[in-house]
């Protein structure tokens, strides 16, 4: 019987993975550990592997997999910047991802957390906790229908986000290297700077690559409309975090919401209760009154989890049986 290791298992995924195995006549072994130099030897008797990595995979894992006859790694996220695709190819390892698992879930997160900042919820909550129930100009908002929203990246998630904002009646500008002609309710601009210059809300939905690395830094924030709101449910490396904090502090941004952080791997998805966080930048984000931080959880719905579990396992089995899969990356 074909054997697949399901690394990075969370409690709510285990039953889904085992049920998939029964339906597909595959022996699925679940493990809470991640694929790494320390765990790769567990795969000696396996045919395939799926995992959910957040940090960079060590280089020595690829030749080890090749020596064990394993032909693939099925990543259970859309992001894949934790893999060296060229090195994997050199060792005959097919890397795959799950490019679409519930774009609407992430879009709903992006809009809902932006609305918290639009309606000044963090400020209102602090005032209420201090028993200040007065109405002040500082907590007055304006309707989204009177706002301009910039969508940076109009793939599946960006497009779904744009459609929600269109339902509010917002004016929508966008930038994407490959414009989507079906999104006739928005206006594409020739550059990111042009797209954001009049935006009240900026919503980021771009992959992590050389072009997007620190795309939003001080130079980009200099082109932002004063008092704008920034939401990042894309990849942490898209933002230069110290520059983001500075932009909020000096009033360039009214506030920001980030679901991803460039150096999140050591912390996000882990329970850090009663432990010291050594990352001073992360602490500054968490403690900032006008920055909302969530732990890479924008995708987290029952539909998305089911699709990620099955997407990873389906890709692994496809490569085992046919040497390729629809979602291969290299």
UniProtKB/Swiss-Prot annotation:
PANTHER family: 2-HYDROXYACID DEHYDROGENASE HOMOLOG 1-RELATED. Belongs to the D-isomer specific 2-hydroxyacid dehydrogenase family. The keyword NAD applies. InterPro entries: D-isomer_2_OHA_DH_cat_dom, D-isomer_DH_CS, D-isomer_DH_CS1, D-isomer_DH_NAD-bd, NAD(P)-bd_dom_sf. Its EC number is 1.1.1.28. The lineage of its organism: Bacteria, Bacillati, Bacillota, Bacilli, Bacillales. It catalyses: (R)-lactate + NAD(+) = pyruvate + NADH + H(+). It is an enzyme of class 1 (oxidoreductase). This is D-lactate dehydrogenase.
């Amino acid at each position: 019987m074909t054997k697949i290791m399901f690394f990075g298992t969370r409690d709510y995924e285990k039953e889904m993975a085992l049920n998939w195995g029964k339906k597909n006549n595959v022996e699925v072994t679940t493990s809470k550990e991640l694929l790494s130099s320390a765990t790769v030897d567990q795969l000696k008797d396996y045919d395939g592997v799926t995992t959910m990595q957040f940090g960079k995979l060590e280089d020595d894992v690829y030749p080890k997999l090749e020596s064990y006859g394993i032909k693939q790694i099925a990543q259970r996220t859309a992001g894949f910047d934790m893999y060296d695709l060229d090195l994997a190819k050199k060792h005959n390892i097919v890397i795959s991802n799950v490019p679409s698992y519930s774009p609407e879930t992430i879009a709903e997160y992006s809009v809902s957390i932006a609305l918290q900042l639009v309606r000044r919820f963090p400020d209102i909550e602090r005032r209420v906790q201090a028993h200040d129930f007065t109405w002040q100009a500082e907590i007055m908002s304006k309707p989204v229908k009177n706002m301009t929203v910039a969508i940076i990246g109009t793939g599946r998630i960006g497009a779904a986000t744009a459609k929600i904002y269109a339902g509010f009646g917002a004016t929508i500008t966008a930038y994407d290297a490959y414009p989507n002609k079906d999104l006739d309710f928005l206006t594409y601009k020739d550059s990111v700077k042009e797209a954001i210059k009049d935006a009240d809300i900026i919503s980021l939905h771009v992959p992590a690559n050389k072009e997007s690395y620190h795309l939003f830094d001080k130079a980009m924030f200099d082109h932002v409309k004063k008092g704008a709101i920034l939401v990042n449910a894309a990849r942490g490396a898209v933002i230069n975090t110290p520059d983001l904090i500075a932009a909020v502090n000096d009033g360039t941004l009214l506030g920001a919401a980030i679901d991803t952080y460039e150096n999140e791997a050591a912390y996000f998805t882990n329970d850090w209760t009663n432990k010291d966080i050594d990352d001073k930048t992360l602490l500054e984000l968490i403690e900032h009154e006008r920055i909302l931080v969530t732990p890479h959880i924008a995708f987290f719905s029952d539909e998305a989890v089911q699709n990620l579990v099955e997407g990873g396992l389906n890709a692994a089995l496809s490569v085992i049986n046919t040497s390729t899969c629809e979602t291969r990356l290299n």
